[in-house]
């Protein structure tokens, strides 16, 4: 079964953030987001779930450093 892939704009809409926020979180948190043959990011449902968790933790006041520790 093939995994559903989402473009960054679709993933950002699902998480209700701007695309630059997803890229920032990827960089700051060391997240491994797959890329296609052209180097474009694509996201899975698991990636979106992870971003929703990150957003929830940010809204609760956690800093990215603490979130990174929780994720790794």
Give the residues covered by each predicted segment.
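Basic helix-turn-helix/winged-helix DNA-binding cores
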Residues: 1-72
């Amino acid at each position: 079964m093939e995994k559903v892939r989402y473009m960054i704009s679709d993933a950002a809409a699902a998480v209700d953030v701007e695309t630059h926020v997803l890229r920032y979180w990827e960089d700051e948190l060391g997240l491994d987001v797959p890329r296609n043959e052209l180097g474009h990011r694509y996201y899975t449902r698991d990636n979106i779930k992870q971003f929703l968790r990150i957003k929830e933790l940010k809204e609760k006041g956690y800093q990215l450093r603490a979130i990174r520790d929780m994720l790794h």
